[in-house]
């Protein structure tokens, strides 16, 4: 009984110092399997769109190929455009940091 009364104030302090579940997750770098697990956590039963890279390549082996059609004119147009702007979940949550609210945008 005496041990319990000594531990109670310590447990109360730990409970006050512990971050709320949403605050513990607010802004993080999430890459690979950690990103997928976070999406499972956030989306729950709604689910999210996910196709593993190996499966994507098996279904469409030409998906990564760049088609330049148009000869030299096509190359010049690509050179003027610069690198493509990537705005996917990997750029948003792995390269940069993202919040739970940003992850929810990728739920079904």
Swiss-Prot record:
Molecular function via GO: hormone activity; identical protein binding; insulin receptor binding; insulin-like growth factor receptor binding; protease binding
Subcellular location: Secreted
Maturation-removed propeptide residues: 57-85
S-S pairs: 31-94, 43-107, 93-98
Protein name: Insulin
Top-level lineage group: Eukaryota
GO cellular component: extracellular space
Family designation: Belongs to the insulin family.
Record's function text: Insulin decreases blood glucose concentration. It increases cell permeability to monosaccharides, amino acids and fatty acids. It accelerates glycolysis, the pentose phosphate cycle, and glycogen synthesis in liver.
Quaternary structure and partners: Heterodimer of a B chain and an A chain linked by two disulfide bonds.
Signal sequence, start to end: 1-24
Main location: secreted
Any one of the GO BP annotations: insulin receptor signaling pathway
Matches recorded under SUPFAM superfamilies: Insulin-like
Keywords, in A-Z order: Carbohydrate metabolism, Cleavage on pair of basic residues, Disulfide bond, Glucose metabolism, Hormone, Secreted, Signal
Matching PANTHER family: INSULIN, INSULIN/INSULIN GROWTH FACTOR
Pfam families: Insulin
């Amino acid at each position: 009984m005496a041990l319990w009364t000594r531990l109670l104030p310590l447990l109360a302090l730990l409970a006050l110092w512990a971050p709320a579940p949403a605050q513990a997750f607010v802004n993080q770098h999430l890459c690979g399997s950690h990103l997928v697990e976070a999406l499972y956590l956030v989306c729950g039963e709604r689910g999210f769109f996910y196709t593993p890279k190996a499966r994507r390549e098996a279904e469409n082996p030409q998906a990564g190929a760049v088609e330049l059609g148009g000869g030299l004119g096509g190359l010049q147009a690509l050179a003027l455009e610069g690198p493509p702007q990537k705005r996917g979940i990997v750029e948003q949550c792995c390269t940069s940091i993202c919040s739970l609210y940003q992850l929810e945008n990728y739920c079904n």
